[in-house]
């Protein structure tokens, strides 16, 4: 299994629509202003979050249960930024839509710009033949409110190509998060 380079990522995006929309370069500025970078990097792709957020709230004072998750635990927020309260979290989705090849697995890691501010981005691996928008989780580990910027870089996807094709892909298993279109809450 080997990590894939910028050249491979560009080729897969062009020939197989692996990432849409796709940015072949690293974008660091918009309208002359510095932003959190996104686009193709040396050995990965820096993804952006859209302007659709689900902000966790404790208004209902319920127990957080992944098997019986109460969707009322979130408030929908749409905008260029999302302010996450102290010691809380928010969900978002990527701007980019992914189509992962059958012989590829990805790992997604938060960008250091956010990590150095106490904001942790968590995403599980994109499995072989998974397709959809990625649901992102932002945890604010600080005692202060934290700001997330929509349409800027939030995490880096690293692509690994296997030496052999898996017997059963995410698509073959009818994975519950296949083809997700928006911010997707826990499913059992």
Curated annotation (Swiss-Prot):
It comes from the Bacteria. It catalyses: dCTP + H2O + H(+) = dUTP + NH4(+). It comes from Nitrosomonas europaea (strain ATCC 19718 / CIP 103999 / KCTC 2705 / NBRC 14298). Gene3D superfamilies: 2.70.40.10. Catalyzes the deamination of dCTP to dUTP. Keywords: Hydrolase, Nucleotide metabolism, Nucleotide-binding. GO terms for molecular function: dCTP deaminase activity; nucleotide binding. Homotrimer. The active site is at residue 137. Signal peptide: none annotated. InterPro entries: dCTP_deaminase (IPR011962), dUTPase-like_sf (IPR036157), dUTPase_trimeric (IPR033704). Belongs to the dCTP deaminase family. The keyword Aminoacyl-tRNA synthetase does not apply. This is dCTP deaminase. Its EC number is 3.5.4.13. Pfam families: DCD (PF22769). One of its GO terms (biological process) is nucleobase-containing small molecule interconversion. SUPFAM superfamilies: dUTPase-like. The keyword Nucleotide-binding applies. Pathway: Pyrimidine metabolism; dUMP biosynthesis; dUMP from dCTP (dUTP route): step 1/2. DCTP binds at residues 111-116, 135-137, 156, 170, 180.
